[in-house]
């Protein structure tokens, strides 16, 4: 724990090595990481290395009760894994309850020595973590929401590398992140959306950004003045400073929310400063810097246009290995729902019409087990732990983006999809209008996937499949299901283990918006899950 003050609120927060945000890990493609975690806080905790493929090292993936039991207070665990075939910006964070509000940091993977970037070498590289600050304890926030059945209280500020900037009350220039640049130099900004519950627009006043990478996968470079980045996603962008010192030497860097939710959200703008060397921006000047032009908070069209710009390099050195044929097709309806008010607080529940908020895929709200699914799978002890019958499509189809059905109640279960090794998979993720259509950033553990198609309205297999991009689709580990729309992804199930796929809005994850893939061993020794480490935490 460390004492941190933001917005005139001083509190003790969980940290890694006393740092908020946590320490930067810099490795090279091919390195093996050995990270010993000792839990000195009162909560259980686990850590996830977000975007690392964990090839045959699922025991190190980190989601609580999926690949391991939590590290108890006073306990420790060694995460050991090798970075295989990946380079770029990823990140690490706690994967238990809402602890990742302060337990997060960058994970930078450099190319092997002697291998250049497929874009101009930058003068400097700068990790930029976009987060949320809660004056209250985030653990108390989600606990209260789950008790009452309503939505959680929203954050009090957005942050750049843990700093909220000058636009908030009781936030000084000392709480403002400053990026100092030299004229004519190019900087690689390694953007990470570490916010708990908000997709964010990002921009730099009077500067154009060149997007070169997404989720540690190179993309065909494209220019943009406003970006959108979802929780869990990373984005590498090049910023070139003006060749000569401009008349004004300080420029606002801003983030603001993108949302279509019908509920409350943190509708504030956080500011950092791009400062040319030699400038000295006063506190008063910081507050009056012109902001970059960002889309309106609900501008889904701007988000769609930006998202459509991403294409893989698809070069000889970095090919796009898109599955052309598919062994198994899945259609997941993704959205909110409700539970009956069986445990009222003060006689009522605070969800819609005296219900409790829930979330689901194919109307199954995921129930977190009390033991590790990977351990149960390795020991083949499934009874009472999981059911291998997650539905491949909704049991009762409906007009997903039209008038919602009258019955909004969800079912519950720890249900998984079993896959044979090397199965090629296509998943269509369809947003629903139940309790309001909204974007859902879905993250798949253990894999990258290709985003082969997207659109608005209800997915139509007879027409939409023909529009797929099977040449140079972007490769990601986290993708937002468009508001009132759909997205199609493909991957090859060549990594044995149990891999959760979940919404990276933590409130939706808390309400059950997740499922898991159980990928069986292949026939060869290098296609099998190794035994668990001797120090893996036990649940009982």
From Swiss-Prot:
Residues the record lists as binding Cu cation 2: 50, 93, 504
EC number(s) from the headed UniProt entry: 1.10.3.2
Domain Plastocyanin-like: residue ranges: 1-114, 124-279, 389-523
Catalysed reaction, written as an equation: 4 hydroquinone + O2 = 4 benzosemiquinone + 2 H2O
Entries under Pfam families matching the protein: Cu-oxidase, Cu-oxidase_2, Cu-oxidase_3
Entry binding sites for Cu cation 4: 440, 503, 508
GO BP, sorted A to Z: lignin catabolic process
Cofactors demanded by this protein: Cu cation
Compartments where found: Secreted, Extracellular space, Apoplast
Keywords for the protein's UniProt record, in alphabetical order: Apoplast, Copper, Lignin degradation, Metal-binding, Oxidoreductase, Repeat, Secreted
List of residues binding Cu cation 3: 95, 445, 502
InterPro entries: Cu-oxidase-like_N, Cu-oxidase_2nd, Cu-oxidase_C, Cu-oxidase_fam, Cu_oxidase_CS, Cu_oxidase_Cu_BS, Cupredoxin, CuRO_1_LCC
Name of the top EC class for this enzyme: oxidoreductase
List of residues binding Cu cation 1: 48, 443
Gene Ontology MF terms: copper ion binding; hydroquinone:oxygen oxidoreductase activity; oxidoreductase activity
Entry's Gene Ontology cellular component terms: apoplast
Cofactor mode of binding and number, as noted: Binds 4 Cu cations per monomer.
Domain of life of the organism encoding this protein: Eukaryota
Sequence similarity: Belongs to the multicopper oxidase family.
Protein task: Lignin degradation and detoxification of lignin-derived products.
Protein name listed in UniProt: Putative laccase-11
Taxonomic source organism: Oryza sativa subsp. japonica
